[in-house]
Amino acid sequence: MGKLHLYSGRRKRFPEKLSWAAVEGGVELEEAKAFMLSVWNSDEKSTKCIELWTKDMSMDEMKIFFHQTLLSMTETFQRATGDENMSATMQDFCDYFAEKLELRK
């Protein structure tokens, strides 16, 4: 079974440093400015989330991070459900999101 390790130098509201390792995936120890993890609780039918970002992550980086996360979720939804129509709708939203944040110039 693979393991993911997250290291957070969390002080007060924002961690000063984030790093992670996934040895089986070839990542020994890599720094990151943001991290999101969602887990599904089947008994409660609810999602639990951990969202962390460092104090030095810029607003522009956060916008790009969210956009790329939404794109990844869209791809995962398509693979998991095969629902072409909703996947296209989600992709439309990703395009709208990027346009409104002026991410694609």
Please provide the spans of the model-predicted regions.
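C-terminal charged interaction modules
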Residues: T74-K105
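Structured beta-strand/loop patches that form or line metal/cofactor-binding pockets in enzymes
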Residues: M1-L4
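Active-site- and interface-proximal helix/loop "cap" or "latch" segments in soluble metabolic
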Residues: K17-A80
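Short, acidic, Ser/Thr-enriched surface-loop or helix-capping motifs
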Residues: G9-R10
